[in-house]
UniProtKB/Swiss-Prot annotation:
Gene Ontology molecular function, alphabetical: arginine decarboxylase activity; metal ion binding
Protein name per its UniProtKB record: Biosynthetic arginine decarboxylase
Required co-factors: Mg(2+); pyridoxal 5'-phosphate
One annotated GO biological process: spermidine biosynthetic process
Role noted for this protein: Catalyzes the biosynthesis of agmatine from arginine.
Organism: Gloeobacter violaceus (strain ATCC 29082 / PCC 7421)
Length: 644
């Protein structure tokens, strides 16, 4: 039998698929990050985590790689430049970043900075996001796409922003907004830049398939678009209608769905131009997917196309439609937020403990033990590769009989415990044999998951990976070290919350979703770190404070190519995670009042001799220190490592 290699780990965790071109396994068996792509410098993630801990930041931590964000923006623009060249398209591409995908200030500021050479703009879906866009975007010629529900204040703010040199397009998504826009334009004496969102009949795919169609939340029907044109003509504002927008949903995994929508949208664009609107832009919305599982298929966690193919199809659709009708082609706009921000963030957390189902060789039953126990032991001894299905059926039947006998009072608690241990011992033996079979019977398919260990991890699913809980989103998860060792354990992940939903028990697989993750045994006095990858889109802003676990520590890393060696990076920003005082304040608790309440209670206990002076001092020290401390657990091993 060959020794385990890092290539075995790479294949197991599919890092060559979902990680391309930013993540790999290095010769040390650690995950390496290549923020600028293969061959342009790399960072050992395990060493980086150790370095950050030495600076006093504890687990869990979110690490953002600024260079990945810059590279994603550059790649997207390069793909459209190539598509425009390939099709001899007489127009340009101007992307916008949807602020809702990740509204964190450092992220938005970096998007604007890295997008400046490409006139990369911002998309706002609400009034607060519009305020962010106006305060952050200073790039001449960059677009601000104003989406979402709008009131008069929203629209007037967007119109007045033109006086500052911005290019804000107010996109009509509900017919009612047209009246507000016309009134605001007349009131302020500002000719607006107007877009309309079309409600396409082409359906999306997956969870967000209802973003289009007759019952879609946003957008105008064909009849409503005709009425918009008529009313704009009547108000002498048809010359302001310059942009068509559509959106068929997020994470579109199948390219044929995108092609169908593009054909329909390009026809709408041409018709608007022929109706007299001086159309100049088409915003194709989002949908550019991420390959979370590395399978390169149309599975919901993957995609069957690449970024270049996507750009080719967008350009080709409008080139063909406009040529056919002799209409000038539009400047192309996309809102590819997930594709831009997903790769840049890695959540790293440590394992706090493990619960195993391991039983070993059972002792033979005594002659006077109940027949159920003897039957279970006999089943255990007779398990072979040829009878695993029969043995499992027998063991399951005997276990059910044991539970019935216990409920009727014919079996004691100790005997029930013995029967359960024998049953799980049978399952363990069967599972070890099943793993070697070419074909696994359906009834035994769940055995791996049922026998899996539980790895208790220092993070909150609800705070750091809410989509995993809410919509069964799959994220690549793997150890960030020890990848030159075979991971012989099978486990699921449990978070710190007191909630049975606080777990991850679905993991990426090349052909399907698997119920367990291959992991290593946790060694005493040695940390075990796991990484959750591709979670830079939506997770931070959607995360909630279930059980009052707050934001994690966050660091921004920038590759410093002129500094060779393991320290070839800079910590650009450090954002400390929430303290207990901060999360308590969110739910209207005053930490001073809480501390004073404990002090009074302690003094009362001292007077009544229910607590000693040293105990009261220790309690108050713990209480006060906790108020200023991190909401997550502090592993004593973390403290020791940070001090080294």
């Amino acid at each position: 039998m060959q020794d385990w290699t890092i290539e075995d780990s790479a294949e197991l965790y599919q890092i060559h698929g979902w990680g391309e071109p930013y993540f790999k396994i290095n010769d040390k068996g650690h995950v390496a990050v290549m923020p600028r792509g293969e061959g342009n410098g790399e960072i050992d993630l395990f060493h980086l985590v150790q370095d950050i801990q030495k600076r006093g930041l504890n687990m869990p931590m979110l690490i953002r790689f600024s260079d990945i964000l810059a590279d994603r923006i550059a790649r997207l623009n390069a793909c459209f430049v190539e598509a425009i060249r390939e099709y001899d398209y007489p127009g340009i591409y101007k992307g916008v970043y949807p602020v809702k995908v990740n509204q964190q200030r450092h992220v938005v500021e970096e998007v604007v900075e890295f997008g400046r050479p490409f006139q990369y703009g911002l998309e706002a879906g609400s009034k607060p996001e519009l305020l962010i866009a106006l305060a952050t975007l200073k790039t001449p010629g960059a677009l601000i796409i104003c989406n979402g529900y709008k009131d008069s204040e929203y629209i007037e703010t967007a119109l007045l922003a033109q006086r500052l040199g911005h290019t804000p397009f107010v996109v009509i998504e509900r017919f009612h907004e047209l009246t507000l826009l016309i009134e605001a334009a007349q009131k302020l004496g500002i000719r607006p830049l107007i877009g309309v969102r079309a409600k396409l009949t082409a359906r999306g795919i997956g969870r967000w398939g209802d973003s289009t169609g007759d019952r879609a939340k946003f957008g105008l029907s064909a009849g409503e678009i005709m009425e918009v044109v008529a009313q704009l003509k009547a108000a002498d504002l048809l010359s302001s209608l310059q942009l068509l927008h559509f959106h068929i949903g997020s994470q579109i995994s199948a390219i044929n769905v995108i092609k169908t929508a593009l054909r329909e949208a390009s026809c709408v664009y041409v018709e608007l131009a022929q109706m007299g609107a001086p159309m100049q832009y088409c915003d194709v919305g989002g949908g550019l997917a991420i390959d979370y599982d590395g399978s390169k298929t149309n599975f919901r966690a993957s995609k069957n196309y690449n970024m270049q193919e996507y750009a080719y199809d967008v350009v080709a659709a409008f080139q063909d439609a406009c040529r056919t009708k002799n209409v000038p082609v539009p400047t192309l706009v996309s809102e590819s937020g997930r594709a831009i921000t997903s790769h840049q963030s890695v959540l790293v957390f440590d394992v706090m403990g493990v619960s195993h189902l391991q039983f070993g060789e059972p002792e033979p039953p005594a002659r006077n033990e109940h027949s159920i126990i003897r039957n279970l032991y006999e089943t255990y001894t007779q398990i072979t590769p040829d009878n695993v299905q029969e043995a499992f059926n027998d063991a399951s039947q005997f276990k059910e009989e044991a539970l019935s006998l216990f409920a009727l009072g014919y079996l004691g608690l100790g005997e029930r415990a013995r029967a359960e241990r024998l049953y799980w011992g049978c399952c363990e033996k069967i599972l070890n044999l099943v793993r070697e079979l070419d074909y696994i019977p359906d009834e035994l398919a769940d055995l791996e998951k049922n026998m899996a260990s539980t790895y208790y991890c220092n993070f909150s699913v609800f705070q750091s990976a809410p989509d995993s809980w809410a919509i069964d989103q799959l994220f690549p998860i793997m150890p960030i070290h020890r990848l030159d060792e075979e991971p012989k354990a099978r486990g699921t992940l449990a978070d710190l919350t007191c909630d049975s939903d606080g777990k991850i028990d679905q993991f990426i697989d090349l052909r399907d979703v698997k119920g367990v993750l291959e992991l290593h045994p946790v060694r005493p006095e040695e940390p075990y770190y796991l990484g959750m990858f591709l979670n830079g889109a939506y997770q931070e802003i959607l995360g909630d404070m279930h059980n009052l676990f707050g934001d994690t520590n966050t660091v921004h890393i920038h590759l410093a190519s002129d500094e060779p060696g393991e320290q070839s990076y800079r910590l650009e920003h450090v954002v400390k995670g929430d303290t207990m005082t901060e999360v308590l304040k969110y739910v209207q608790y005053d930490h001073e009042a809480m501390l004073e309440s404990i002090r009074r209670e302690t003094e009362q206990a001292l007077r009544e001799r229910r607590i000693t002076l040293s105990e009261s001092r220790l309690l108050l020290q713990h209480y006060e220190r906790s108020l200023s401390g991190y909401t997550y657990l502090t592993n004593e091993l973390q403290v020791e490592l940070a001090a080294r």
